[in-house]
């Protein structure tokens, strides 16, 4: 088994606390509404949203995958940090054991924030992670973030 780590950063004009609340804490409800072309629904399989919670993320018709199951590993409300692992479905299967993800939202002096993202792909055997797989995952995350950001800009009273 190998572990391939990919890190990225992206910025947002939304304050860190508000984005954490909307994108992370309430994302299961908000994202299917603001980005139905990317995620059709999120089901809570077990748990209360904290560590150990299992969620099933369903994708719309025509998407390359029907679903993924995520396990919440950490929710740090003070430091705006969220860790979760993709444990089933989507790209996880013959070549990948799981994908561990860490999102940390850091406030910036201009009132916005930076999202620091780390993705660890845990492969099976000697398999390597393909660049297009990492690119597709990054693009999906960016699509979801921008949809939430647009919603928050249009609804200044939401998720404060």
From Swiss-Prot:
Keywords: Allergen, Cytoplasm, Pathogenesis-related protein, Plant defense. SMART domains: Bet_v_1 (SM01037). The keyword Cytoplasm applies. InterPro entries: Bet_v_I/MLP, Bet_v_I_allergen, Plant_def-hormone_signal, START-like_dom_sf. One of its GO terms (biological process) is abscisic acid-activated signaling pathway. GO terms for molecular function: abscisic acid binding; protein phosphatase inhibitor activity; signaling receptor activity. GO terms for cellular component: cytoplasm; nucleus. It is found in: Cytoplasm. SUPFAM superfamilies: Bet v1-like. Brassinolide binds at residues 55, 82, 84, 101. It holds the Pfam family Bet_v_1. The keyword Cytoplasm applies. May be a general steroid carrier protein. Belongs to the BetVI family. This is Major pollen allergen Bet v 1-G. The lineage of its organism: Eukaryota, Viridiplantae, Streptophyta, Embryophyta, Tracheophyta. The gene is BETV1G.
